């Protein structure tokens, strides 16, 4: 199984509970793939770039990333993005562009998206969700 972590879960893990998260990630990684989308990586890198403690935060991010697989957003993902965006617009549902890209990526990879933003993502059909922020 592929678990694809959303940006908010990564930030939570890095800043709030690194030891317990790292232990859980290592256990899960024995039988599963723990990954992030390259879209999530871009959001995390943006967070580092705008922070006041760039070196410290880059180091924390690098340590966190060393435990994960980074999956590039591919041409296959663009199909799901186009379909999802059209469907949601027709229903009058607005979802942030990056969130829609991340959701499309998770669906294309047949991954479970791990997020604490269930309210936003539950509107997306065929997206498997879990919340580890408990």
UniProtKB/Swiss-Prot annotation:
Family: Belongs to the PINc/VapC protein family.
Residue span, PINc domain: 3-124
GO molecular function: magnesium ion binding; RNA nuclease activity
Encoding gene (name): vapC2
Cofactor(s) of this protein: Mg(2+)
Protein name per UniProt: Ribonuclease VapC2
Binding positions (Mg(2+)): 6
Record's function text: Toxic component of a type II toxin-antitoxin (TA) system. Has ssRNase activity. Upon expression in E.coli or S.cerevisiae inhibits growth in liquid culture; in S.cerevisiae its expression leads to apoptosis-like characteristics. Rapidly induces apoptosis (within 2 hours) upon microinjection into mouse fibroblasts (L929 line); pretreatment of cells with dexamethasone protects them. Probably contributes to host cell death if bacterial cell lysis occurs during host infection.
Subunit architecture: Forms complexes with VapB2; probably VapC2(4):VapB2(2) in the absence of DNA, and VapC2(4):VapB2(4) in the presence of DNA. Crystallizes as heterodimers with stoichiometry VapC2(4):VapB2(4) in the presence of its probable promoter DNA. The heterodimers are in contact via alternative VapC-VapC and VapB-VapB interactions. This subunit does not contact DNA.
Keywords on record: Hydrolase, Magnesium, Metal-binding, Nuclease, Toxin-antitoxin system
Organism of origin: Rickettsia felis (strain ATCC VR-1525 / URRWXCal2) (Rickettsia azadi)
Entry annotated with the keyword 4Fe-4S: no
EC class (word): hydrolase
Transmembrane stretches, start-end: none
Enzyme Commission number: 3.1.-.-
InterPro entries: PIN-like_dom_sf (IPR029060), PIN_dom (IPR002716), Type_II_TA_system_RNase (IPR050556), VapC_family (IPR022907)
Keyword Metal-binding: yes
Pfam families: PIN
């Amino acid at each position: 199984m592929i678990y694809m972590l959303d940006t908010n879960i990564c930030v939570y893990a890095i800043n709030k509970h690194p030891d317990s998260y790292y232990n859980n990630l290592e256990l899960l990684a024995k039988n599963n793939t723990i990954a992030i989308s390259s879209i999530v990586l871009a959001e995390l890198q943006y967070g580092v770039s705008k922070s006041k403690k760039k070196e410290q935060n880059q180091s924390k991010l690098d340590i966190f990333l060393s435990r994960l697989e980074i999956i590039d957003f591919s041409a296959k993902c663009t199909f799901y993005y186009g379909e999802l965006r059209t469907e949601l617009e027709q229903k009058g549902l607005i979802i942030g562009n990056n969130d829609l890209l991340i959701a499309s990526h998770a669906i294309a990879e047949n991954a479970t998206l791990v997020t604490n933003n269930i309210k936003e993502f539950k509107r997306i059909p065929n997206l498997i969700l879990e919340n580890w922020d408990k």
